[in-house]
């Protein structure tokens, strides 16, 4: 028989830098998970993606065991990295902070494809372009 799920915890943690301090510790401590075991496993799985924020979905079972799924980094984080900027524009309709090429947008869309509910790469690109627009990033061909 399948184990009974008691909690699903969603967090965004920097790759390779999970530690028992907040926000990881309290979120998993409440569910009774072995926090150090999670941190070691997460850091090992995400060591190759240093510098990115990785969304993770932790499923906690009745016997306090857990499994977790790492997702692709948020589009905004990937766009900031591609554009080489620290943060998006506070007023994206007035102040443009950076410009990126359409082929960079395609790369990001291809990377994000498993987590987006888009049927084609073009639809995924439009989603990423919308995120870029709302951050004050201009896309050129």
Curated annotation (Swiss-Prot):
Instruction: Mention any one GO cellular component term assigned to this protein in its UniProt record.
Output: cytosolic large ribosomal subunit
Pfam short name (any one): Ribosomal_L11
Key word ATP-binding present in the record? no
A GO molecular function held by the record: large ribosomal subunit rRNA binding
The keyword ATP-binding is assigned to this record: no
Under InterPro entries, the record lists: Ribosomal_uL11, Ribosomal_uL11_bac-typ, Ribosomal_uL11_C, Ribosomal_uL11_C_sf, Ribosomal_uL11_CS, Ribosomal_uL11_N, Ribosomal_uL11_N_sf
Cross-referenced CDD domains: Ribosomal_L11
Modification after translation is described as:
One or more lysine residues are methylated.
Name a biological process GO annotation.
translation
Print the keywords alphabetically: Methylation, Ribonucleoprotein, Ribosomal protein, RNA-binding, rRNA-binding
Query: What does the function comment of this entry state?
Result: Forms part of the ribosomal stalk which helps the ribosome interact with GTP-bound translation factors.
PANTHER family this protein is in?
A: 60S RIBOSOMAL PROTEIN L12, LARGE RIBOSOMAL SUBUNIT PROTEIN UL11M
Q: Which family does it belong to?
A: Belongs to the universal ribosomal protein uL11 family.
Q: How does it assemble?
A: Part of the ribosomal stalk of the 50S ribosomal subunit. Interacts with L10 and the large rRNA to form the base of the stalk. L10 forms an elongated spine to which L12 dimers bind in a sequential fashion forming a multimeric L10(L12)X complex.
Name this polypeptide is given: Large ribosomal subunit protein uL11
């Amino acid at each position: 028989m399948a184990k009974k799920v008691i909690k699903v915890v969603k967090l965004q943690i920097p790759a390779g830098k999970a530690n028992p301090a907040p926000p990881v510790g309290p979120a998993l401590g409440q569910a009774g998970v072995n926090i150090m075991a999670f941190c070691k496993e997460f850091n090992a799985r995400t060591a190759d993606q240093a510098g990115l924020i990785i969304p993770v979905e932790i499923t906690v079972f009745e016997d306090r065991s857990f499994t977790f799924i790492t997702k692709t980094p948020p589009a905004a984080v990937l766009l900031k990295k591609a554009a080489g900027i620290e943060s998006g524009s506070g007023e994206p309709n007035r102040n443009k902070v950076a410009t990126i090429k359409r082929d960079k947008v395609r790369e990001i869309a291809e990377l994000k494809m498993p987590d987006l509910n888009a049927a084609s790469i073009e639809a995924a690109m439009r989603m990423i372009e919308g995120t870029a627009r709302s951050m004050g990033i201009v896309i050129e061909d």
